[in-house]
């Protein structure tokens, strides 16, 4: 049976939904700025989570009243979308959405046409975004990166850590965040290409204490076939033995007599050769082998391209300055591949990243790109307790996203200053149509909100601060941490352009659509009063 629905119209619908918007935004906005507080979230399992990450808080909010919940979910959409695009700035986005809805509803209630108001909002936001892009300046060097990260994470240490990581692996590199069981937070950088396959047999190690094998100036045989018969690779082995070099074999698998022969020779000390299985699966495996071949200047020996193992000569093998193999990983450092070919391969992967629609594929391509072009850095987060660890990890992930965004589109004065700076651009807009003008004014007013909130969270009167910032020269903003007015960029208080831009665009998009709501429909909750027969009150104690 279809559930009955309850329907609300016009003013009532908008008011109830606005209540939900306010509940969500008021919860999130206490975290804004350097003196913002945290919010604690109850978790069904384990310790509660303490965080100041807007989107993490927003995701937790579900309201009982269906209409209020609709409002809250709409604003949650703003936070999530901003998080997807820029990875940070979710609190700002939520705050802006609330401000636009609040100002907009005043006008719509007063009889303005919501469609025209929305038009005005869109015009003003376009103008503001243009203004933000004009004040934006590119990220220059490690200093800037450290600043962006430090502001986002509210922690100078983290800023330095991320800047170090970016410096080591370059903009193409991949930086991941992992939990560690130590107290401190540290950086681990893997130079060269690493994949997660280790030696096939522990007898192949060269250092029995560390249980790892390291091959200097090694040859690398790359194939997608299974090697069982030593005769297949004998010709090429003999050539390498004569040169006194070492060999790494990357193949689908190596077993039986072939494996036994290699191990026996290693133990006798005649020849050092380590075999590992090829990384990845299916098509991705082929691509990864191709990557390794490009990096080391070798060829993939595969029947698909008509190359057979017994025809392999030394010039088909890859070369690398050193290879390190542990039980779980293989790392190839300084492959001797042709620079131009590596560059072509990198560009090819970049093109695939642009085209792919699957998030999973994009991540895997990004990893391959990093291994070819930069390297991989791992930030290992440590803390005294689980609760603090989770909180730190969230902040580092946000800071990392902010840093990437800054590299892409540059930086602007932080602390809400950039929004205040573009108000005068919006003021230049004019419209003959009264209601469109109202939309423009709504945005003008909402752009003050971030500065107000940061001031308010620092215990200062927001109106005074915003007036002061608006009437100071460009680039002067309010430093809430030290309670003074400074040149934001010089003081190192910066935000990524992409984050600020996305926050405003997403907020305006959802908020202006919200204003055009004329009816809201929700399920009527069923009243389930009859307990099961024979078990009065039994159900109360159960979940």
Swiss-Prot record:
Belongs to the chaperonin (HSP60) family. It is an enzyme of class 5 (isomerase). It comes from Clostridium tetani (strain Massachusetts / E88). PROSITE patterns: CHAPERONINS_CPN60 (PS00296). It catalyses: ATP + H2O + a folded polypeptide = ADP + phosphate + an unfolded polypeptide. This is Chaperonin GroEL. Forms a cylinder of 14 subunits composed of two heptameric rings stacked back-to-back. Interacts with the co-chaperonin GroES. The keyword Flavoprotein does not apply. Together with its co-chaperonin GroES, plays an essential role in assisting protein folding. The GroEL-GroES system forms a nano-cage that allows encapsulation of the non-native substrate proteins and provides a physical environment optimized to promote and accelerate protein folding. Keywords: ATP-binding, Chaperone, Cytoplasm, Isomerase, Nucleotide-binding. Its EC number is 5.6.1.7.
């Amino acid at each position: 049976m279809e559930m009955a629905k309850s329907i609300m119209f016009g003013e009532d619908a908008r008011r109830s939904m606005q209540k939900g918007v306010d509940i969500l935004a008021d919860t999130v906005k206490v975290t804004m700025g350097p003196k913002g507080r945290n919010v604690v979230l109850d978790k069904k399992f384990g310790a509660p989570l303490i965080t100041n990450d807007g989107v993490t808080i927003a995701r937790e909010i579900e309201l009982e009243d269906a209409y209020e919940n609709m409002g809250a979910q709409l604003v949650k959409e703003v936070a999530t979308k901003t998080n997807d695009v820029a990875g940070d700035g979710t609190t700002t986005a939520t705050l802006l959405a609330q401000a636009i809805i609040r100002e907009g509803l005043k006008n719509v209630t007063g009889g303005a046409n919501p469609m025209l108001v929305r038009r005005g909002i869109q015009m003003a936001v376009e103008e503001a975004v243009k203004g933000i892009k004009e004040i934006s300046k590119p990220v220059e060097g490690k200093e800037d990166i450290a600043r962006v990260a430090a502001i986002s994470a509210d922690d100078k240490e983290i800023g330095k850590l991320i800047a170090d990581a970016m410096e080591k692996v370059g903009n193409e590199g991949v930086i991941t965040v992992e939990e560690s069981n130590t107290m401190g937070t540290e950086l681990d950088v893997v130079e060269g290409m690493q994949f997660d396959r280790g030696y096939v047999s522990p007898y192949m190690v060269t250092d029995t204490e560390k249980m790892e094998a390291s091959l200097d100036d090694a040859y690398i045989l790359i194939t997608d076939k299974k090697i069982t018969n030593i005769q297949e690779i004998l010709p090429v082995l003999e050539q390498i033995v004569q040169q006194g070099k070492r060999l790494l074999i990357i193949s689908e698998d190596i077993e039986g007599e072939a494996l036994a022969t290699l191990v026996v020779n290693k133990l006798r000390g005649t020849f050092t050769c380590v075999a590992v299985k090829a990384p990845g699966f299916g098509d991705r495996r082929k691509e990864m082998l191709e990557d390794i071949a490009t990096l080391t200047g070798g060829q993939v020996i595969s029947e698909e391209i008509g190359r057979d193992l017994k025809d392999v000569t030394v010039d088909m093998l890859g070369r690398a300055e050193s290879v390190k193999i542990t039980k779980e990983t293989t790392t190839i450092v300084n492959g001797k591949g042709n620079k131009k070919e590596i560059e072509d391969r990198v560009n090819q992967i970049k093109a695939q990243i642009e085209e792919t629609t699957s998030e999973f594929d994009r991540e895997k391509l990004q990893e391959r790109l990093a291994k070819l072009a930069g390297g991989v850095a791992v930030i290992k987060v440590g803390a005294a307790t689980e609760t603090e660890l989770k909180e730190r990890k969230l902040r580092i992930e946000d800071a990392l996203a902010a840093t990437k965004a800054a590299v892409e589109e540059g930086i602007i004065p932080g602390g809400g200053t950039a929004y205040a700076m573009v108000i005068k651009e919006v003021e230049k807009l004019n419209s003959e149509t009264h209601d469109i003008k109202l939309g423009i004014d709504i945005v003008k007013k909402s752009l003050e909100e971030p500065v107000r909130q940061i001031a308010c969270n620092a215990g200062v009167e927001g109106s005074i601060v915003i007036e002061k910032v608006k009437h100071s020269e460009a680039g002067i903003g309010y430093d809430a941490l030290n309670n003074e007015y400074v040149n934001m960029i010089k003081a190192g208080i910066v935000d990524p352009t992409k984050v600020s831009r996305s926050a405003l665009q997403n907020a305006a998009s959802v908020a202006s659509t919200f204003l055009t709501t004329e009816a809201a429909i929700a399920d009527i909750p069923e009243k389930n009063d009859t307990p099961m027969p024979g078990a009065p009150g039994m159900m109360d104690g159960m979940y």
